[in-house]
C-alpha cells in the first residue's frame, strides 16, 4: 500500500506541472489573429497627451476610419512607409506629433515610429492609419505640397 499512496501524489504533481505549462505555451501564440496594429498618436512630447487604438482588419474595426486604414494598409502590404503620400498643402505651424504602431500583418511583425511637424503632415504621409479621432478631421488641404 505504501507504494500505491506514493504513486498517487507523484502522478498529481506531474499533472499539475503539465497543466501549469499549458498557459505559458498559449501565451507564446498570437493574442490577436489576423492583420492588426496597435496605433498611438502622441501630441507634443508629453506621454500624457496620447491616444491609442487597436486597429483590426478582419473585419475592419478600431477607430472611425478603420475600413479606409485597412484598405491603405492592404495596398501597401502592411508597410506604413509604402502608403502613397497625399498631394496636400499643410500649414507651416509647428505642433509636433509622433506616430507609433506595432502589430502583425500577413504573419510579419510590424514596427513603425515617426515624428511629424503637425497632424496635417501625419495624415498626409500615413493616410487613415493614424486618423484616430471619432470626428471627421479637417485633415490636409488638397493641393500641391510645398
From Swiss-Prot:
PROSITE patterns: SSI (PS00999)
Keywords (A to Z) from UniProt: Disulfide bond, Protease inhibitor, Secreted, Serine protease inhibitor, Signal
Compartment(s): Secreted
Entry's Gene Ontology molecular function annotations: serine-type endopeptidase inhibitor activity
Signal peptide span: 1-26
Entries under Pfam families matching the protein: SSI (PF00720)
Disulfides per UniProt: 57-70, 90-120
Domain of life (superkingdom): Bacteria
Coiled-coil regions listed in the entry: none
Single GO cellular component term: extracellular region
Family the entry assigns: Belongs to the protease inhibitor I16 (SSI) family.
Protein name: Putative serine protease inhibitor SAV_2156
Amino acid at each position: 500500500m505504501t507504494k500505491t499512496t506514493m504513486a498517487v501524489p507523484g502522478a498529481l504533481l506531474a499533472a499539475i506541472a503539465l497543466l501549469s505549462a499549458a498557459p505559458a505555451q498559449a501565451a507564446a501564440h498570437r493574442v490577436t489573429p489576423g492583420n492588426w496594429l496597435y496605433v498611438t498618436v502622441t501630441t507634443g512630447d508629453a506621454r500624457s497627451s496620447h491616444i491609442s487604438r487597436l486597429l483590426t482588419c478582419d473585419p475592419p474595426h478600431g477607430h472611425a476610419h478603420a475600413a479606409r486604414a485597412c484598405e491603405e494598409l492592404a495596398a501597401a502590404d502592411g508597410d506604413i512607409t509604402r502608403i502613397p503620400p497625399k498631394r496636400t498643402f499643410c500649414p507651416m505651424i509647428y505642433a509636433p506629433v509622433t506616430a507609433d504602431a506595432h502589430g502583425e500583418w500577413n504573419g510579419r511583425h510590424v514596427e513603425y515610429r515617426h515624428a511629424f511637424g503637425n497632424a496635417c503632415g501625419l495624415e498626409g504621409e500615413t493616410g487613415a492609419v493614424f486618423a484616430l479621432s471619432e470626428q471627421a478631421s479637417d485633415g490636409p488641404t488638397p493641393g500641391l505640397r510645398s
